[in-house]
Design a protein with these regions (language model features):
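Generic preference for flexible, low-structure residues
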Residues: 14, 37-39, 66, 71, ...
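Short small/polar-residue motifs
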Residues: 7-10, 43-46, 76-88, 107-113
Length: 148
């Protein structure tokens, strides 16, 4: 446990819960024909921005090319409504937070459970209902947006 790590964790949690952050994607886990064997795709220059109760997707072509987070997904228009649940601190200090991404049609919903690791700004997001339209689990970092 480093002071830098604890600070990064605190800043990330604060930025997320106040609805003012960027989630930089590092790896996306793509379902394959064998459900237990996810394909890992490294990604760069792709991120989500959370502003208040909105989630906006900025995905590079490499990611768009494989239809990540698209199809009949809530992020089709590039932006969706977001509900952030109450943070739950686990015994090891990791924090679990549920995220609900709601598209323009009521059935276009992603349910995500984010784990923010206790001594860093790294998070992993577990997608529920993975079969639905490019709803993938992923790993990344949470960074605060600069105050405007």
């Amino acid at each position: 446990d480093t002071v830098e790590g604890q600070t990064a964790h605190h800043v990330a949690l604060q930025a997320l819960t106040s609805g003012n952050c960027k989630i930089v994607l590092e790896e996306i886990y793509i379902p394959s024909d064998r459900p237990e064997k996810l394909r890992t795709q490294q990604v760069s220059d792709s991120y989500f921005v959370i502003k208040g109760d909105k989630l906006r997707a900025y995905l590079t072509r490499e990611v768009d090319g494989s239809k990540l987070f698209s199809g009949i997904s809530p992020l089709n228009g590039g932006e969706a409504d977001l509900q952030i649940g109450e943070p739950e601190v686990r015994h090891n200090g990791d924090v679990n937070i549920s995220l609900r991404v709601q598209g323009s049609q009521h059935y276009r919903v992603f349910e995500w459970v984010m784990t923010l690791y206790h001594d860093s700004n790294q998070c992993s997001v577990q997608a529920n209902k993975v079969y639905m339209a490019g709803n993938y689990s992923f790993k990344g970092r949470i960074l605060p947006l600069p105050e405007k």
